[in-house]
């Protein structure tokens, strides 16, 4: 290539074209280019010395030089036609890339999905290892660059399979990420022809040990001779463990007889773990040291339009992603779900090309299962003519039914306003598409959703009224004023409600009390966006209030109706826990009618089963309420009678005095995303920890909480596993604390559950999650997020059911 030559690009702002323009400029060539719009990509080229010409005009074509065009440039383009008239050399983008790579060690990445990420990861590793590679990548890095000419022999580039340009390349190293029904319109609709093209490309690699392919992709198996990578055991580069930790991935793999443990990747999603594995394989093949590989992956800054954050608000998150094929959409949403947990995901999808939508229609309908809501907007045609496809409204309806989400069609021009009206605090929005959907995120960069109106309900009719107030006073200080407008409701011991200005100690909560159905209270509750009950005992955490809020159609925090009711029934809890193999303390249930009719028979059965001391416990009260330690028959009979004053059901339980009390906290939805804390221990002065000692009432020293336990890792793992079993079998939703006894032999026995555990300053629930690295504010956020999720799931099922009924009726 003659360095005196001038290169003119028709469409210089395109991602592939601009990368090559960068390389030419870095190598000292003169470059000009035209495009319809000027953005950051062209600004970077101008800064290097390129001449930018807006729009397309015949006069832009130089008298001498080489004209570069891409597959997207139509043959009737005025500059293309003028170049033909002037008989100037016309070179396709792919041909220029092949020329630029001549006499260099070319590392080319091809495949239907993931090319940009894999090539970017390889580049990052080589840069960290000080190899200074050249690169041409289909996405902008953190410096807004996609092309660069380095000083070394290495040249890393994407090899686009979509337009037949693979024939121009002769790679030293090849990576094939996968093969899908993508770009089939360029292969006469034949996936087989696409596969043959990929196969021919890999055959150009002289050494099979320099050809890497995805061994989990069925379409590639048996076609390619090389090094397979993936999650299957038969892969030569075998990823044998992976997990996602928030916005990062951690994985381990084996390659060439060596294990590489706990690699930290600054990307999310199983698909990106596979992408990173391919990059690792290439790097190791070239002898790059493990330390450089690990550092590059850990600090990888990502690629723009790949899970890129677009907004500044801390109340919600707006991401942009290039995913536009159903497989990409599905993988992206799955990774996002694992990162954000129970937060509502709103996917804004702009289908890209009518032909892709037609070829992938069935997959498209099922691609959104990890979203909560989908906004479907108009197809970005990319120059194609419309095809015979269902209407946008019909597409949205089918997505709703197939992906089990609420999907709504919104015309492109209305999307921004629709989002402004519907985005809620804690939402995660993600735009999906390769067209101009990125404008939505730009428009919402500084948008702030309105704060949630949260009503804190506390007090209650139970004997734990005072503890509820203490818990509420502690929790409300962590309700962020940037996220929430908070109102306070106190229920007195008679069940009457009052709305108060604050929960300060010494406030008079009894001056203006109303029935919950009074207009004053009902109207105040109706205006709330969310209710946060912080109530202990009957009428608070037993499903009663939860049922009322369900009827009122209000989202609420803490346990669900069913979970509350079961958890506060200690007998039912024991039965369900035992059904999944969780050891429960031996017990014998007793009902009031049975006790009234046959007290002697009841006593005889108890004495035949248990020895003194034993415990009499109420079935539906708190963990330390209505619990009596008895030592003889007289005490037993008296305390059973007393227990029936507080509850309709009681049970006798074998004593576990001398055992340690180990407790574990839970938060989230047991059916999807939940968190289990590390165990803590509650220690009293002696024996059973009663209500007064538990909370330090009436002058008693409160029981102490020990977080750094003298327990083996095996025991800690065991109690957490038992906790998880209990939480899942009772379908935990919201929050709870699960209590166990640990006997002298090292056996754990389920004691009980507390669906709304104490949250006072000294209570362990908040501290349990704080010790996992959360702030108290984040924990309270999570209580609200879990409540919103619980409400959204029920609403989604209800709306889908009603819609399906309507469709059935119409048919």
UniProtKB/Swiss-Prot annotation:
Q: What is its EC number?
A: 6.3.2.8, 6.3.2.4
Which biological pathway?
Cell wall biogenesis; peptidoglycan biosynthesis
- Which EC class is the enzyme in? ligase
GO CC terms in record: cytoplasm
Query: Which domain of life does the protein's organism represent?
Result: Bacteria
What does the record give as cofactor? Mg(2+); Mn(2+)
Major location, coarse class? cytoplasm
- Report the co-factor binding details: Binds 2 magnesium or manganese ions per subunit.
Under Gene3D superfamilies, the record lists:
3.40.50.20, ATP-grasp fold, A domain, ATP-grasp fold, B domain, Mur ligase, C-terminal domain, Mur-like, catalytic domain, NAD(P)-binding Rossmann-like Domain
Task: Give the span(s) annotated as UDP-N-acetylmuramate--alanine ligase.
Answer: 1-450
The residues listed in the UniProt record as binding ATP, with positions renumbered to this chain, are 111-117, 607-662
Task: Please name the Pfam families in this protein's record.
Answer: Dala_Dala_lig_C, Dala_Dala_lig_N, Mur_ligase, Mur_ligase_C, Mur_ligase_M
One Gene Ontology biological process: peptidoglycan biosynthetic process
Keywords on record? ATP-binding, Cell cycle, Cell division, Cell shape, Cell wall biogenesis/degradation, Cytoplasm, Ligase, Magnesium, Manganese, Metal-binding, Multifunctional enzyme, Nucleotide-binding, Peptidoglycan synthesis
Residue ranges occupied by any ATP-grasp domain in the UniProt entry = 574-785
Show the InterPro entries listed in the entry. Answer: ATP-grasp (IPR011761), ATP_grasp_subdomain_1 (IPR013815), D-Ala_lig_Van_CS (IPR000291), D_ala_D_ala (IPR005905), Dala_Dala_lig_C (IPR011095), Dala_Dala_lig_N (IPR011127), Mur-like_cat_sf (IPR036565), Mur_ligase_C (IPR004101)
Instruction: Cite the binding residues for Mg(2+) 1.
Output: 739, 752
What PANTHER family does the annotation carry?
A: UDP-N-ACETYLMURAMATE--L-ALANINE LIGASE (PTHR43445:SF3), UDP-N-ACETYLMURAMATE--L-ALANINE LIGASE-RELATED (PTHR43445)
Similarity annotation: In the N-terminal section; belongs to the MurCDEF family.
**Name of the protein in question:** Bifunctional enzyme MurC/Ddl
Lineage at the top is: Bacteria, Pseudomonadati, Chlamydiota, Chlamydiia, Chlamydiales
